[in-house]
């Protein structure tokens, strides 16, 4: 604010401090990816952005995929720029799992009406620094770990088969 910027931020459903959709609050889940896009449209429309000369979206990881898809599907958007940090434009799988990942999750979803963790995923489990794939900075990782310890409602484990 003091630098002349107005910042609007939100946690998309099932992440951060937003409501979880399942009784297993660790499971990353959404009924349909377009729900994320619809939520973003609601947030953008809630704020009168017409007074701004420029409007940027800064998005990280899955937020990058959501922001990109929002801009693609809402040509009337007020956004003049998009800044993406490690956008999730695909799921990083070993080469031998890529061809079977979608059929396996479709079968799992058809067999059970209840969402289950996607293969290879589980409830939230804090990895030691040496085994974490997200940060090479011990200080940053400890800050992140401390935040999750102080605010366990932020923790999210693996995604569901329906995610």
Residues of each region from the PLM?
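Conserved Rossmann-like nucleotide-binding pocket used by diverse enzymes
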Residues: 8, 58, 83
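Alpha/beta-hydrolase-fold enzymes
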Residues: 62, 66-159
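Conserved alpha/beta-hydrolase
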Residues: 1-23
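Localized chelating/binding microdomains
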Residues: 6, 25-29, 56, 67-74
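Conserved serine/cysteine hydrolase catalytic core
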Residues: 163
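Short loop/turn motifs at secondary-structure junctions
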Residues: 4, 51-53, 77-79
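Alpha/beta-hydrolase active-site loop
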Residues: 28-48
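Alpha/beta-hydrolase fold nucleophile elbow
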Residues: 49-61
């Amino acid at each position: 604010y003091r630098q002349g910027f107005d910042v609007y931020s939100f946690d998309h459903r099932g992440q951060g401090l937003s409501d979880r959709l399942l009784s297993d609050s660790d499971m990353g889940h959404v009924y349909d990816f377009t729900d994320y896009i619809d939520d973003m449209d609601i947030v953008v429309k809630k704020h009168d952005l017409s007074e701004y000369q420029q409007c940027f979206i800064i998005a990280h990881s899955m937020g990058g995929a959501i922001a990109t898809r929002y801009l693609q599907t809402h040509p009337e958007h007020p956004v003049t720029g998009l800044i993406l940090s490690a956008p999730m434009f695909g799921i990083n799988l070993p080469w031998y799992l890529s061809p079977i990942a979608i059929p396996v999750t479709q079968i799992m979803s058809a067999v059970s009406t209840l969402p289950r963790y996607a293969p290879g995923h589980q409830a939230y489990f804090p990895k030691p620094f040496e085994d974490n794939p997200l940060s090479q900075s011990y200080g940053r990782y400890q800050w992140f770990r401390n935040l999750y310890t102080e605010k366990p409602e932020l923790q999210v484990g693996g995604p569901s088969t329906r995610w």
